[in-house]
Regions:
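Substrate-binding/access-modulating region of protease and related hydrolase catalytic domains
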Residues: 86-176
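Active-site-proximal beta-strand/loop segments in catalytic clefts of secreted hydrolases
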Residues: 22-25, 84-86, 118-122, 152-155, ...
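Flexible, small-residue-rich helix->loop connector segments that border functional cores
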Residues: 22-29, 58-76, 104-109
Length: 235
């Protein structure tokens, strides 16, 4: 049965860390509004934004333990800095170079925020020999601004066609970023992964030059196929 989540809010007198959310924007809803910082950054006017993905990511950051039914964090919550660097793709085309510059501008203007989450990237597999321009740009942004980017390893759908997993996506080959892969924390009747094994959709290493990527893993759900239909657990 679906998990019922109770909206929470910051408690007066407690100091919470701030995480910058480099994404599509964060919606004003009862679960997230109280955690959003008063200031924000955007590369696009509201009519060219769709905050669905950014809100989904923010919800996992803010309510991860509650959604997973686990207790893995010491933090009761974090403030969310909304950095909308990616548009509604049905209304506006964006290229990697544009995205990099939006990320750079958001970070440079807000250097007081030291931890940033980036769950956007490309679907292009990284090279075994050469680092991508995207990955190197993320390294440069972190070096110049003394910040840390938490980066998703990337997802792939190869499991739906019984194909091997893709390796990490370009941008997840950033050396400086902490790249996060996904583990299954539960197993439904049609799911492919065993509990505590890599999620069927998560990408794997190594990175260029045999560097270890992803750096860490965390629970992100499970999936499988049933008569040609995608089945998901905990996503």
């Amino acid at each position: 049965s679906p998990t019922t989540i109770v909206a929470k809010a910051p408690i007066e007198g407690i100091e919470y860390p701030v995480v910058g959310i480099l994404d599509t924007g964060i919606a004003d809803n009862p679960y997230l509004s109280a955690w959003k910082t008063a200031d924000s950054f955007t590369s696009y006017p509201d009519q060219y934004k769709d905050p669905s993905h950014g809100s989904f990511v923010s919800g996992i950051i803010e309510y991860g333990d509650e959604l997973n039914g686990l207790s893995t964090t010491m933090l009761p919550g974090v403030h969310l800095f909304d950095a909308a660097v990616y548009p509604d793709s049905s209304k506006q085309t964006i290229y990697v170079d544009d995205l990099v510059e939006h990320i750079r501008e958001a970070v440079e203007r807000n250097r007081h925020i030291k931890v940033w989450n980036l769950s956007l990237g490309t679907s292009i597999e990284s090279s075994l020999d050469d680092f991508s321009d995207f990955g190197m740009a993320l390294d440069n942004i972190q070096d110049e601004n003394n910040v840390l980017i938490i980066k998703s390893a990337g997802n792939c759908t190869n499991f739906t066609r019984q194909l091997p997993k893709s390796r990490i996506a370009q941008s997840a080959d950033s050396v400086r970023s902490v790249v996060v892969g996904s583990l299954a924390h539960a197993k439904g009747p049609y799911d492919y992964a065993e509990v505590d094994a890599p999620s069927p959709f998560t990408r794997i290493g190594p990175g260029p030059g045999s560097i270890v990527k992803p750096d860490v893993v965390f629970y992100g759900g499970n999936a499988g196929m049933n008569a040609g239909k995608l089945e998901k657990t905990g996503i």
